[in-house]
Amino acid sequence: MKKTVLITGAAGFIGSHLCDYFLSKNYKIIGVDNLITGNLKNLSHLNSNMDFQFKKIDITHDFHIENSIDYILHFASPASPIDYLKIPLETLRAGSLGTENVLKIALKNNARILIASTSEVYGDPLVHPQPEEYFGNVDPVGPRGVY
């Protein structure tokens, strides 16, 4: 029996490529996205794939997936300083409420989960490249504060 992967942010750049990758490795994919920054065009080539299903879901609200889930790849979040300024509350909610709701799905299914992030969490670095010990330069009221 094929394992099932839930991919949040599936219509985004990275999420859509993860859908392609895991389908090529013979997994079933449930892709979810609220389409605030994602684009269905990134997934249009998968419409006829029987192992792929897309659900327009805002993960910042409680949601339910009927299928059994084995793995979750959590990539749902605006990930650009431009988005942080344009849609700050949506960004904040994706990282907080969205992550909490995805963790509930993982717990219910006893699924393994990978939570993605970006270097944006470190703010504007004072050193380049940043060593492993670097704690960042984050301004909590600056444009990256919502991420």
Question: What kind of region is each of these model predictions?
Answer:
Residues 1-147:
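N-terminal Rossmann-like NAD(P)+-binding domain of SDR-like oxidoreductases, especially those catalyzing
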